[in-house]
């Protein structure tokens, strides 16, 4: 446990250093002209026009079917936005679509009360798991561990993110999850979280795969620390905010890696952790307006309060945008 904890702490510091040391200018690499951007926008508009006649039918579907169709729409959009046809990418998206259909069926089988948005939230992690599978040289699949871990998101994140819970209630909830992940729940416990943990145990028995459970406990700890971000932070807490964000994002995808292999070398964990950091940044960027309205502190809400997040300077002064972290 200490080894993985130390690795995650080290990677958190390393990626924080990378973030802080990144130039505030635009990154090197390919750029797109306004004409190329307009072409892509037209292709997206065409896809939307083709989809409009199906909206009424979509609204009449059961929630599980709606989640499945939303997954197919994301697959189609992903293919469209890739830079030209690539058989490998097309194959990956097609395999993810097939996996998504089975995921929706099994999620509904596990809990018929899950909403379409809950299933889609869980499905997003399943696709992250699939991308890690391919990165590690495997094939796209749906496994008991990936299904269970993905379904933990709507059951835990949504409860912890909801307003109205006291600090004591949140701590008690976190403690109950910790005990379950450490194997302290009763064998006959029919609660949702114990059932999900048992699904992971069926694929990865505790005796032979301690790293899997160490990783799950690591994301639980990171999740608990990140609850501080639901309160406004003082300017002096910028580094704390940065550290919590990076740790939570990296640790979440580290679990996916462990569920692919059962264990990872430090060299394998490094890029997978970094992948999780990037996904966390994207998530926080997408949720920026919602988080700001709720009073949650993220790197993006803080930057937004200081000025436009997509500009390198405001009124000629550096230090007022997300891309300047000095």
Go through the PLM ranges and name each one:
Residues 86-154, 158-174, 180-292:
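All-alpha helical catalytic cores of prenyl diphosphate-utilizing isoprenoid enzymes
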Residues 10-25, 50-61, 79, 83, ...:
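Surface-exposed polar/charged interaction patches
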Residues 7-10, 14, 43, 47, ...:
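Charge-rich, solvent-exposed alpha-helical interaction surfaces
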Residues 267-326:
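Active-site/pore-lining binding-face segments in mid-to-C-terminal subdomains
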Residues 18-23, 42-48, 67-70, 163-172, ...:
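Short, compositionally biased low-complexity segments
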Residues 1-37:
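Intrinsically disordered, low-structural-confidence terminal and linker regions
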Residues 54-105:
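Low-complexity, highly charged intrinsically disordered N-terminal segments
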Residues 36-52, 143-151, 155:
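Amphipathic alpha-helical protein-interaction segments
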């Amino acid at each position: 446990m200490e080894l993985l904890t130390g690795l995650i702490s080290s990677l958190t510091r390393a990626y924080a250093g990378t973030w802080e040391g990144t130039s505030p200018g635009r990154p090197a690499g390919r750029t797109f002209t306004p004409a190329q951007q307009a072409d892509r926008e037209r292709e997206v508009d065409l896809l939307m026009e083709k989809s409009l006649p199906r909206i009424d039918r979509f609204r009449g579907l059961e929630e599980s079917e709606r989640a499945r169709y939303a997954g197919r729409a994301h697959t189609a959009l992903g293919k469209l936005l890739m830079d030209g046809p690539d058989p490998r990418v097309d194959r990956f998206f097609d395999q993810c679509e097939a996996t998504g259909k089975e995921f929706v069926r099994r999620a509904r089988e596990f809990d018929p009360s899950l909403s379409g948005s809950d299933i889609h939230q869980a499905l997003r992690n399943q696709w992250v798991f699939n991308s890690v599978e391919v990165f590690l040289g495997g094939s796209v699949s749906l496994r008991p561990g990936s299904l269970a871990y993905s379904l933990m998101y709507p059951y835990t994140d949504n409860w912890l993110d909801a307003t109205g819970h006291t600090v004591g209630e949140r701590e008690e909830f976190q403690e109950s999850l910790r005990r379950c992940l450490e194997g302290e729940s009763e064998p006959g416990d029919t609660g949702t979280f114990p059932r999900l943990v048992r699904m992971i145990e069926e694929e990865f028995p505790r005796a032979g795969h301690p790293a899997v459970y160490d990783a799950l406990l690591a994301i639980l700890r990171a999740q608990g620390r990140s609850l501080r971000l639901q309160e406004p932070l003082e300017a002096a807490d910028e580094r704390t905010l940065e550290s919590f964000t990076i740790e939570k994002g990296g640790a979440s995808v580290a679990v996916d890696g462990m569920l692919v292999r059962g264990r990872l070398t430090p060299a394998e964990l490094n890029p997978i952790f970094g992948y999780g950091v990037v996904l966390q940044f994207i998530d926080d960027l997408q949720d920026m307006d919602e988080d700001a309205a709720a009073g949650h502190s993220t790197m993006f809400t803080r930057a937004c309060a200081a000025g436009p997040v997509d500009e390198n300077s405001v009124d000629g002064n550096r230090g007022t945008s997300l891309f300047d972290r000095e």
